[in-house]
């Protein structure tokens, strides 16, 4: 996990900070490639507080339960929040991929889930869909990188570049407002460890402006 909650019970000053950034100096904060996102919303802050209290009480990993709401509306925009490993986050990522109409971009430290790899390949084979991806851990055990390349998916390795590509985000249909421009980000790598063992969080924001900001990155 990498999140902060500020004043969850405040109606005007409730904040959540999420994304991929560890508070480590100097690597993650100043050198590695990461993203941080701030959301001001009381309901989302309270959902994160429920998750924090569960872990504060000693429940981690598979001992946690799916006890938080997942769907919110912030300034008229749909926002979703999922925690791992309790909330079946991978199934939501699969839906995110399958719902793409035109474009999908992803930037990931690790990508080792076969089901997600297959979903990306199947989506890339659909007429009119353009997919681009960046993966840091090209040669880690079980990496989907070689499978994606062999299938003709436009994916690039970040391995060997100075400083780590520590992101865990994906962007759907960023420049197609007739579709559903959406950002998916957080601390959840596309891996079985993130799905089944690690304590992670994922934020999905249905908003063209936010999606385009991440597309520019």
Explain the meaning of each model-derived region.
Residues 1, 5-217:
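Charged, low-complexity intrinsically disordered terminal segments
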């Amino acid at each position: 996990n990498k999140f902060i909650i500020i004043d969850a019970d405040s109606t005007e000053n409730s904040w959540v900070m999420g994304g991929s950034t560890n508070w480590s100096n100097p690597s993650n904060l100043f050198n590695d490639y990461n993203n941080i996102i701030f959301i001001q919303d009381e309901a989302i802050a309270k959902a994160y507080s429920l998750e924090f209290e569960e872990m504060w009480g000693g429940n981690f990993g598979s001992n946690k339960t799916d006890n938080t709401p997942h769907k919110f509306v912030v300034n008229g925009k749909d926002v979703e929040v999922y925690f791992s490993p309790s909330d079946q986050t991978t199934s939501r990522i699969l839906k995110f991929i399958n719902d793409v109409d035109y474009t999908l971009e992803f930037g990931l430290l690790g990508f080792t889930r076969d089901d997600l790899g297959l979903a990306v390949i199947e989506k890339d084979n659909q007429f009119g869909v353009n997919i681009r991806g960046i993966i840091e851990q090209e040669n880690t055990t079980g990496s989907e990188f070689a499978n994606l390349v062999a299938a003709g998916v436009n994916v690039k390795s970040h391995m060997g570049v100075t400083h780590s590509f520590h992101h865990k985000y994906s962007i759907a249909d960023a420049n197609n407002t007739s579709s559903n421009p959406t950002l998916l980000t957080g601390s959840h790598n596309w891996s079985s460890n993130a799905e089944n063992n690690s304590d992670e969080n994922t934020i999905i924001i249905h908003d063209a402006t936010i999606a385009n900001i991440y597309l520019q990155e």
